[in-house]
């Protein structure tokens, strides 16, 4: 006979599964059509090569150059 703890554990497992599935859907979205930085169109070739692209090549290069100093190495 299930008790309250079993019921709550089942609810938590279902909630976790829904959250994981929602996160997977967010990361598998289509590429943006325009760059989030400069609003220039993102070429179809870039969107095909990098499906989750949100920046044009130029803006992505600048973004990576700025952020490479903040990466931590293990």
Swiss-Prot record:
It comes from Escherichia phage P2. This is Uncharacterized 8.2 kDa protein in gpA 5'region. Gene3D superfamilies: DksA, coiled-coil domain. One of its GO terms (biological process) is positive regulation of secondary metabolite biosynthetic process. It holds the Pfam family zf-dskA_traR. The lineage of its organism: Viruses, Duplodnaviria, Heunggongvirae, Uroviricota, Caudoviricetes. It comes from the Viruses. One of its GO terms (molecular function) is zinc ion binding. Keywords: Metal-binding, Zinc, Zinc-finger. SUPFAM superfamilies: Glucocorticoid receptor-like (DNA-binding domain) (SSF57716). A zinc finger (dksA C4-type) spans 35-59.
